Amino acid sequence: PDYLCMDGTIPRARLAEVLTRIDELSSEFNLAVANVFHAADGNLHPLILFDANVDGQTEQAMAMGARILEVCVEMGGTVTGEHGVGVEKLDTMCVQFNAAELEQFFASKRAMDSADILNPGKGIPTLTRCGELGGLHVHGGHLTFPEIERF
């Protein structure tokens, strides 16, 4: 068996509620979960158990992991606690942050790495990526950053 270790944070007062939601997701995805966490600081590490030798289970585990991180955000937490974003959590960053907030991330990155040579494509999702995932919010019929090509 294989496992996927997630890393999200939640307000400590919502731990029981989040564990209940993770249990519901476990049933929905038909994958077992071993919940480990730092209860004192609200840092969760659900271990999603699956068999990579079974067609589709790896993708199913990844989808379940993304849903767990969405639950963390819904509960007032974040998509990452101590393990960072990298590429694994780029899509869930679109759930937690809006376009203006992501632009602040990019502004900081440009200030320190104007040539974009330090871990390009990692840590901050592009606005195009968020748009493709449905993470961009259209308000009053106005699309933010209309110059970005979309399909």
Task: Name these PLM-found stretches.
Residues 1-151:
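Conserved glycine-rich FAD pyrophosphate-binding loop
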